[in-house]
Regions:
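Non-catalytic interaction-recognition regions
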Residues: 1-266
């Protein structure tokens, strides 16, 4: 692909088109809209500039035929070019930083990637500063996330095909929501997909999450369906109270009453 093989590029483009169509379909189910989606190939020109600028600044060393950059405080250097002349993820990540800074000049760039890539981003961020792609006003952040684990607490095995596909999870969540009493399709989707989102967000970002249908769809405790149920009940009470003329002055609540209100609120 990097050498410009036309046949390989056509096959690759077909794979990209099919994948993006599927991604968009799932994003739509989740209510997610992507403003800009640039794949690695988009940065082909930027990658050449990165290599040229790294050489120009004299920060590149040769190691066993590969081109690397030493990173302060790290034993392992960051590889920009393999011995066979192929670029690396790091080179393309640096090209991405270069493009984003020149295009949008953001104050913060957040990378939401697995915790196992921590060293990679420490090195990339360091080299990005060496190349002067980011100024002192720009913060580069790696938000580390954990893994989804099988119900037995072990990693899902992609090689053995023992995984749970997101689309299957969303579909099953909607069906389970119907069994909870959400017979209307729109309501079932709101409850089911909401449960999946809430289950994910209710855990710490860096924590591994054990996949558990019972906790995800529970009608009690810290779950999406329970939060939605509570909200619906609250709205019902407020609607019935519209005809009543009353007001509450928080200044008139005593300490015990305030504690009760705060306990309910949490």
């Amino acid at each position: 692909l990097e050498e410009g093989d036309e046949r390989a590029r056509k096959v690759w483009q077909k794979c990209v088109d099919v994948s993006m169509a599927e991604f968009e379909r799932i994003y739509k189910l989740l209510g997610v809209e992507i403003d800009n989606a640039y794949g690695e190939s988009f940065y082909k020109g930027e990658v050449k500039e990165v290599m040229a600028e790294a050489r120009e600044k004299g920060i590149v060393d040769e190691s066993e035929g590969a081109l690397v950059v030493e990173v302060e405080g790290q034993k392992t250097p960051l590889m920009l070019l393999k011995s066979d002349g192929v670029t690396t993820y790091a080179t393309r990540d640096l090209a991405t930083v270069r493009f984003r800074m020149r295009t949008w000049n953001p104050e913060v760039i957040i990378y939401e990637v697995g915790a196992e890539q921590a060293l990679h981003f420490i090195q990339v961020f360091s080299v990005a500063k060496k190349l002067q792609y980011v100024s002192d006003r720009t913060v580069l952040i790696h938000t580390k996330h954990g893994l989804y684990l099988a119900p037995d607490g072990k990693k899902f095995s992609t090689r053995e095909g023992k995984t749970v596909k997101l689309e299957e999870v969303l579909g099953e969540a909607v069906e389970r929501a119907k069994k909870l009493g959400s017979e209307d399709e729109a309501t079932a989707k709101a409850v089911g997909i909401g449960a999946v989102k809430y289950f994910d967000l209710a855990h710490g970002v860096a924590s591994d999450i054990v996949f558990d249908w019972e906790k995800m769809m529970a009608l009690e405790g810290n779950s999406g369906p329970y939060v939605q149920y509570t909200y619906a009940r609250t709205q019902s009470v407020l609607k019935k109270a519209e005809s009543l003329e009353f007001g509450v002055d928080s200044c008139e609540l005593n300490l015990e009453e305030l504690r009760v209100v705060r306990w309910i609120y949490r």
